[in-house]
Amino acid sequence: VCINRDFGDWQPRRGALEQVMARIRPATFVLEPGVYKDKLPPCHVVEMRSDMDRTAYEKMKKDYLVELGGAEITALTAAAVTSKLQQMAGGWVYDTVSEASDKAGVFKSYKYAHWFSTHRFDMLDEILEGNQQDNTILVYNFVEELAQLKTRYPHLWTLDDGADVVKRWNDGQIKLLAVHPKSAGHGLNLQYGGNKMVFLSLPWSLELYEQTVGRIHRGGQERDVWVYVMLTNKTIDERIWSALADKRAISEIALEELKG
């Protein structure tokens, strides 16, 4: 049942989950992490909350437009404003500018980031200092976040920095590794190089979130895993985090149904 078409919010009809589980149970074998292999260490998830001046944020939320740095930034659809609100929760927002090209009737589009708050990166500095420079994975969702990470932390590595990045990380040679959830999925083993991960912003997909955490919380990890989730109070961050928690609850119920 669609409960919010603008934002793509759906929830199962009453009894639908039980019906689906009953259909697939005969052909399903549930393998829980750590039950048939070595036990996994605990995974601690810590909410790192901060505040910001929400004047521009509330303006975008209400009017689908805001003026920053002399530019009028607009969102044409509810889906577009959702993305911009997530950006603004991080202290910045994209502005798309179109310019005429050499070909008649053809325009080129460019994205520019307008920054109005550094609260999130200031908190990231505190987290990294508190971690005593332990090897840490930084998870980003937007290119601008990666650009800012590279500016603030020149020793930062990404998975695109060479074929041996994973090996160097697992050998303890990389202090900071930036990954995107879509590039840190199934089959990537990062558990030997560190046990700490910071989500600069969150994906909407529970699978992407869990698979990203699973790069360090997996067989072979010998230390407790610490996952820091950065949230700006009274913004869409809280809604995304709540949505992930709800989806996780449904998936846990589904697993219980399959076991029954």
Where on the chain are the PLM-derived regions?
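Conserved RecA-like P-loop NTPase helicase motor core
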Residues: 146, 156-247
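Short amphipathic alpha-helical segment within the helicase RecA-like ATPase core
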Residues: 148-151
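Conserved RecA-like ASCE P-loop NTPase motor core of nucleic-acid helicases/translocases
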Residues: 135-142
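Long, largely alpha-helical accessory region at the distal end of helicase-like NTP-driven motors
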Residues: 255-260
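Inter-lobe coupling linker of SF2 helicases/translocases
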Residues: 1-119, 125-134, 227, 244-246
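Short, solvent-exposed loop/turn segments at secondary-structure junctions
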Residues: 2-3, 29, 53-54, 88-94, ...
